[in-house]
Amino acid sequence: MLKTLENLQLFAHKKGGGSTSNGRDSQAKRLGAKAADGQTVSGGSILYRQRGTHIYPGVNVGRGGDDTLFAKVEGVVRFERKGRDKKQVSVYPVAK
């Protein structure tokens, strides 16, 4: 009887977990509008963060190297249509 127990092999009754190629996600880039239509902004304020030109710069608005739109002067923000299928954002100074 002892000889049969010597050859006894124990196997796992649950398989190993293994690995997966999922489980990662990039951080959100916080893109989109940073100023609303009709809002008063100061010069240099970021109006819209984007990748590419979803919205084009209008009056008194500049475009940064990463396509971010920013106000060149202090004024009121206006989101407008540019032709049939494009949009632009402009900043109009407030008359004092």
Curated annotation (Swiss-Prot):
A GO BP annotation: translation
GO CC terms: cytosolic large ribosomal subunit
Residue positions assigned to the propeptide: 1-11
InterPro entries to which the protein is assigned, alphabetical: Ribosomal_bL27, Ribosomal_bL27_CS
Pfam families: Ribosomal_L27
Region feature (Disordered): 13-36
UniProt keyword Ribosomal protein, yes or no: yes
PTM per Swiss-Prot/TrEMBL: The N-terminus is cleaved by ribosomal processing cysteine protease Prp.
Gene Ontology MF terms: structural constituent of ribosome
Keyword annotations of the record: Ribonucleoprotein, Ribosomal protein
Taxonomy, superkingdom: Bacteria
SUPFAM superfamilies registered for this protein in UniProt: Ribosomal L27 protein-like
Entry similarity comment: Belongs to the bacterial ribosomal protein bL27 family.
Protein name: Large ribosomal subunit protein bL27
